[in-house]
Amino acid sequence: MIWHVQNENFILDSTRIFMKAFHLLLFNGSFIFPECILIFGLILLLMIDLTSDQKDRPWFYFISSTSLVISITALLFRWREEPIISFSGNFQTNNFNEIFQFLILLCSTLCIPLSVEYIECTEMAITEFLLFVLTATLGGMFLCGANDLITIFVALECFSLCSYLLSGYTKRDLRSNEATMKYLLMGGASSSILVLGFSWLYGLSGGEIELQEIVNGLINTQMYNSPGISIALIFITVGLGFKLSLAPFHQWTPDVYEGSPTPVVAFLSVTSKVAALALATRILDIPFYFSSNEWHLLLEILAILSMILGNLLAITQTSMKRMLAYSSIGQIGYVIIGIIVGDSNDGYASMITYMLFYISMNLGTFACIVLFGLRTGTDNIRDYAGLYTKDPFLALSLALCLLSLGGLPPLAGFFGKLYLFWCGWQAGLYFLVSIGLLTSVLSIYYYLKIIKLLMTGRNQEITPYVRNYRRSPLRSNNSIELSMTVCVIASTILGISMNPILAIAQDTLF
C-alpha cells in the first residue's frame, strides 16, 4: 500500500515537472527557434540512422547542412528585434548574442563539407561525427545566450564534452587517444576552476545566479569591492584562459591539434574560441563591472604572453598543425585587445569583425591541410616543398590564407588587424598594440617561410610526397575544395567590403 502511494506521488510529481517544462517550451520556444531547428535536425539524424543503411550516407550530410543553413536563416530574420529575456531569466536574446551564434553556425556549416572526404577515406562513423558536431554547435549557441551561471555551465559542458569526443574520434590512433586524454583532463580542470569562481560570485551576491541580479546582489551586500571579488575574478579568468588557449594556459593546445583528426581541429579552432569569447565578454562586462581595471590588467598580461609565446614557438615547429596551434594562441592575443577596449571605442565591433575574418582564414588553411594530408599522408612542413609545381590551385589557396593570417595587405586579415589595433590605440593601449604589431611582423616570417617552400622548384628540396602527388583538376566536385574556395575568396575580398561589416558589428553592441 505504501509503495502504491509513493508510486502515485512519483507519477504526479513527474507529470507536474513535464507539464511545467512543456509550458516553458510552448511560451518561450519561439525565442530559441534557431536552436530548436538544430534539435529537430539531431532527432532526424538519429531516426534515419536507425532505419537506413550505408547507402543513405549522403542524406546525413544534407540534413546536417540544411538544419544549419535554416538555423542561420532564422537568426537573420530575427535580426534587430528588441532584446528579450526568456525561460524565467535563464536565456537572453539580443543582437550581440546572435552575432556570436551566427559565427558559430557559419563555422559548423563550412566544417561539414570540409569533413566529408576525410570521413570516407578514414572510414569513421558518419552519424556520430555529425551528431557531435551539431550538439557542440547547439551547446555553443546556448552558451552565447545563457543569462545565469547554471545555464552557462551546462551549455559550456555540452560543448566541451562533444569536443572531447570529437578529438578522440579516431580511436585506433594512439596520438588521438593521447590528445583526448590531455584535452579531457585539462578541460575538466579548467571547468572546475571556472565553477569555483562562479561559486564565489554566488555567495558574495547573496545567492543570485542571473548575471544582472549578481550585480544588484553585490551592491546590496556591499561586496563589489571586496577581496572575494578579486578571488572570483582570478578563478574565472584562469578558467576562461584555458578555454581560449591563452598563455600560460595553452599547454594542451598543440598536442590536441596534432593528435586530433584535422577536420575536428578546424572545427574546434574557431567554434571554441567564438563561444568562449561570447562568454568572456558577458561574464567580465556584467558581474565584474566594478572591477574593470583589475580584469583589464589581467587580460593585458595574458594577451602579451599569448602574442609573444604563441608567435615565438610557432617559428620552431615542424608540424603544420602544431604551427597553427601556436599561431592561434597568438591570434587570440590580438582578439583580447577588443575585449579590453570594450564598447566605448568600438572594441567589440573590431573583435567581431576580426573573428569573422579569422574564421575564413583559419578554415581555409585547414581545408588546404586536409586536402594535402589525404593525398600525401603527411603533416610535416618540409613535405610541402614544391607543391606549386604539382597543384598550383592548392598551393596558391594555402599561400593566400597564410598571408591573410599574417596580416599582409590587401587581404582581409590586414584590415581586421588594422581596425583592431586602431581601436586599441584610440583607447590608450599603446604598449599592448605595439606588442601586437611587433608579433604580427614576427608571424609573417614563419608564414612566408612556408610559402617559400610551396613555391620552390628545386628538385633537391622536393620530397617524395610531392613527387608522387596525385595531380587534381582545376575544377572538382570535391566538397573540401568547395569549402576551401569559399574561405579563400572570403579571406581575399572581405577586407575590401569592410564598411558594411563594421556597421553590422557596431549594431550588435549591447
From Swiss-Prot:
Family: Belongs to the complex I subunit 2 family.
Database matches in InterPro entries: NADH-Q_OxRdtase_suN/2, ND/Mrp_TM, Ndh2_N
Tree of life domain: Eukaryota
Keywords: Chloroplast, Membrane, NAD, NADP, Plastid, Plastoquinone, Quinone, Thylakoid, Translocase, Transmembrane, Transmembrane helix, Transport
Taxonomy of the source species: Eukaryota, Viridiplantae, Streptophyta, Embryophyta, Tracheophyta
Record-given protein name: NAD(P)H-quinone oxidoreductase subunit 2 A, chloroplastic
Cited Pfam families: Ndh2_N, Proton_antipo_M
Segments passing through the bilayer: 31-51, 59-79, 99-119, 124-144, 149-169, 184-204, 229-249, 261-281, 295-315, 323-343, 354-374, 395-415, 418-438, 484-504
